[in-house]
């Protein structure tokens, strides 16, 4: 058995937050109006080794996929049960499917989040296709409807699904947006809130042009969203501040959140703060200072510092 598995589980004395489990309307109100940001805890199989390495666990610490997923779940449970991870500054958390099905602090993860005032979301995409026409579309999601019903039964509020834009290809970006909104219709029909995530790579040489094409395609797609529905958008921080203002202020958009896209936290927060009305939905920028070797006190102090910095950048 790898050495790491002999370490004790990290535990915290659980305070009584007195926060009841939230119903859909309460979660909707929180996500739409409250101050805070959305934590992205949804690394999938392909990105898990990198996330574990950042956490201080090398690949030789596990030998099977199940051990790997067990380690990443322990990391996420440690975050979710840390005293600083509460609905005061964290609006929501995006979960990987296995995390949704697991437990934190002896409770199902969605329930544990709601008890802390944090709204649960679920990553539903199955990864990316190979690049074509400057973009990477989402792979097929054949069991989406069943997954949505299971998520809703567990108290999940919304979903997230990611595509990637590598070049300023008008036809490629139009295809990305169409696919995203087509899937969003299924999610809305299931009674869940879709987060639409067409990421523009920060490595793209024509990133600013991609931002503009994407904005205009999303504006066209929003015209077809019925008046009784809204969607959320998760976008790369634009190359030029204010590019997405029309999306932030659109009546069919509940909230626009930003991915860190490879920026370290100080730079991600500085860039985000230039875009009024955008809030963070960071993953690596949230987790980058956390290490499995830390004591409970050290871990929570590092997490609290990251939460405070990201919350402040989201409050502009």
Describe each model-derived feature in a short phrase.
Residues 132-136, 159-174, 201-208:
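Surface-exposed cleft-lining segments at the edges of enzyme active sites
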Residues 2, 67, 171:
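Short, surface-exposed alpha-helical recognition segments that flank or form part
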Residues 3-22:
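Short, Lys/Arg-enriched N-terminal segments with co-localized hydrophobic residues
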Residues 122, 176-190, 211-226:
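Alpha-helix-loop-beta-strand connector modules within alpha/beta enzyme cores
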Residues 106, 173-177, 208-211, 293:
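Conserved strand-to-helix beginnings and helix N-cap segments that scaffold or border functional pockets
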Residues 152, 173-176, 193, 200-204, ...:
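Conserved mixed alpha/beta catalytic, RNA-binding, or beta-rich assembly cores of soluble enzyme
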Residues 157-163, 191-199, 234-235:
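Short beta-strand segments at enzyme active-site cores
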Residues 18-157, 165-167, 217-316:
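Alpha/beta catalytic barrel-like cores
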